[in-house]
Amino acid sequence: YLPRHNKDRGWHRFYSNLELVVIDEGHEYGGVMGTHVAWILRRLRRVLAHYGADPQFVITTATIGNPAAHASTLTGGEFSVVSEDGSPRGNRDIVLWEPPLDDEALEGYDDGSGDLMEGFEQARRSSAREASSVTAHLAVNGIQTLQFTTARQGTEIGAKQTVQAVRDHPRDGYIDVEPYHAGLGKRKRRSVENQLKSADLDAVISTNALELGIDIGSVDATVTDSYPGTKQSFWQQIGRAGRGTSDALSVLVGGKDAMDAYILDNPGYLFDDDTVEDAVVSIDNDRVFADHLLAAAAERPLTAEDAPYLGGEGRFREMTAMWQDAGLLEQAGDLDAGGVTYAGDRRPQSRISLYGTTGIDYEVVCTNGEIEHDPVATERAYRDYHEGALFLHAGQQYEVTEVDHTQPHPRIHVEEVATTHYTQTLSTKQVQDLEVKDHTSLAGDYDIYFGTGTVRITYGNYMVRDYQTGE
């Protein structure tokens, strides 16, 4: 709504009288998305200053190591930290679960080397299948459970495996279980959220899309398939169970990653406040900054007074001159006299994708049925929706028959199929054009380098797996 601030008197009054801006789950704004949000908030502060408003900003976060610094980088303002937690809470049992060895997979492994450690690790049941078994056991015993996994296809496969685990469970029963992820259509997501909140579902298998922000009430237990990568994500996920004074159970099923093994051997790491990670966001990405500078110019002419909001004096003038040379900003404009206006032929805000850098999304259409599928970003389209790809979506299997790149809005054509298989894309990565900007040395002769470069990802092959066996 920033572009409409001067086109609608309602927005004029709103911005003029704004006194408080609240940003929830501030720790989530990192990476490319965090960079976009940081520039949107600076554009907001610029428009507010135009109307003489100076509201207070309040940011809520999970436990992070740098709350004040992160909030400042995100908004450009200064912050004080309130860290005392006075919220009510019940008892919580946290279980760290190591998948057992799979005897069949271990048979015949000994190659004569005498070192069976790697074989033991590879012969463990997968964390995904083990998590599904734990979820099934809890749900069939009347404990409403929310399971977290790392990938969208993992939620779909996990839902199938959970149903199968209930069939194999010694206690007869039936459960309602649904997958949940951002690729589902909005109506389907809202349906799952409402059914979970009303306890009509016994279990939901979700990506981190349900980790925060969405009101689903309180479940009895959470199951996390593999360590989610940060302590803040871990605590956010287990916090979905037993809100208020209700008791809760949370199970972390360890994966094959080295970090999972470390946590299973050193559980105190999860409870050590001295090892809380920092939230990381940067506004140094010039490509993102350039797009937001055009958006700011379309919202109101750029002047020298905007430098504090838009990158600082030198960077602001340099990027303005670049866009003037390109013809997207008024070439005759002057930052010091009258300002510089936007000269492009369409809304520059439409160029910006908060979750990536291309802004191009693929529409998914089904040629022999119906599919409610949100648009697919370019990177995901190349990785997961190539021709021949098999995938589960809302419990239905589909095959990609054609990818049409020629349309203004590219399309992925799929067909409903009857199969128990899915595809897993294989990739190679090359890092080129490295430019080292800084480095440091660590104990043990380890060097860490920081710099810029080009990462080239090639998707050339894929595997076909059975979602019931993983083979």
Positions of predicted regions on the chain:
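Post-DEXD/H (motif II) to motif III coupling segment of the RecA-like Helicase ATP-binding lobe
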Residues: 10-12, 20, 27-88
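Conserved C-terminal RecA-like helicase domain
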Residues: 71, 90, 126-127, 132, ...
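Conserved RecA-like helicase motor core of SF1/SF2 enzymes
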Residues: 172-186, 190, 197-261
